[in-house]
Amino acid sequence: MRKRVVIAGGGTGGHLYPGIALAKALKRQDMDIEIAFVGTQKGLEAKVLPREGFELKTILSAGLLGKKRLSRWMSWVKLPVGTAQSMCFLIRKRPDLVVGVGGYTSGPLVLSAWILRIPILIHEQNSIPGLTNKWLGKITDKVAVSFKESARFFSRDKVTVTGNMIREEFCQPREAFPKGPRGLFRVLVLGGSQGAHSINVAMMEALESLTSKRGNIHITHQTGESDFAMVKRVYENSGFSHDVRPFIDGMAEQYRKASLVICRAGATTLAEVTACGKVSVLIPYPHAAHNHQEKNARVLEAANAGELVLDHELSGTRITQSILRALEDPQRLEEMEENSYQLGNRDATEKVRQICMDLLEDANRKSGHAGKTQGNYVLSCF
């Protein structure tokens, strides 16, 4: 009988791409597995998943933390609606497993799966779990975590340290991707899938200070949509070799070519950076829930695999200093690259895939299989 898996996650690339990595790994194992995603219409998933060939069910959902009073109230209103939508979708889909990989939709979908007694796996990306995953961990069957530091927040019999899931193309050997032209120092600037205004501004300021080195530097810069025109105009007038885009596809190749990565400190970004063995200047998003990005970044800083710059300390001068240190001390850069590579976890997706397969096999053995249980519910879903 064909197995069905529903994955909840999205909003940003940091939550979406681990889900895609898992979906592709499951399909490689068994092409007959049917996979669907649950996300929101406004999230990145609405653009990416159709292109990747996966079904997407959209529900009403929004974050609660870091919102103003009116926005928080609207988020609370959406929560029961999104949960009802999730439950109706699960009853129709009759999945054998639900996987929550973070993002606004994980909570409603996992809660619905628990009510319907569908096996559940959640994946916690950050070193310190958020309140939602701490609570969801109590009702799920299994929990996969990226950092060993976060395992203590969940039951020992449920939790497995897997690392953070990344797409297959990030797991190739170092030599699989050629570096850029010999002698050219390549800086990759990222603000996440939505861009980061403070990083964009600091980088534009740094260009003037780096003028004497512009013959040695190429900059690839993902700006996000809102700052794209402004940033592109500054680069065009700077004389630097550059590639400026609102969003970059084929990110693995960009990482492989990079000499230095300037980026936020989301768990997925750090997993990709370390899998490729790249040195990073980490600028944590200051409004991340529970300050988890700074905590993530400090793991790399402690291993001498990256440099931490807090957002309120960010300036063109700080960026210039970081680039020049990396450019002018190749031995230090090489040592940090090795440290980064050693931190990389290139089999995390396979570990999570195996947990999924174990749960699917276990569900088939049990008489109270999720699909049969759902048949006992008589609901009208419109």
Q: PLM features: residue spans?
A:
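Glycosyltransferases and closely related glycan-assembly transferases
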Residues: 85-98, 105-121, 134-139
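Acidic donor-binding loop of glycosyltransferase active sites
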Residues: 95-97, 256-271, 278-279
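Active-site-proximal region of nucleotide-activated glycan assembly enzymes
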Residues: 34, 44, 55, 114-175
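Conserved nucleotide-sugar phosphate-binding/catalytic loop shared by glycosyltransferases and other
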Residues: 2-10, 29-78, 225-227, 312
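A short, well-ordered alpha-helix in the C-terminal region of glycosyltransferases
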Residues: 332-346
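Structural loop-to-beta junction motif characteristic of Rossmann-like glycosyltransferase folds
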Residues: 54, 118-119, 259-260, 277-285, ...
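Donor-nucleotide binding loops and adjacent catalytic segments primarily
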Residues: 38, 43, 48, 52, ...
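C-terminal alpha-helical cap of glycosyltransferases
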Residues: 345-382
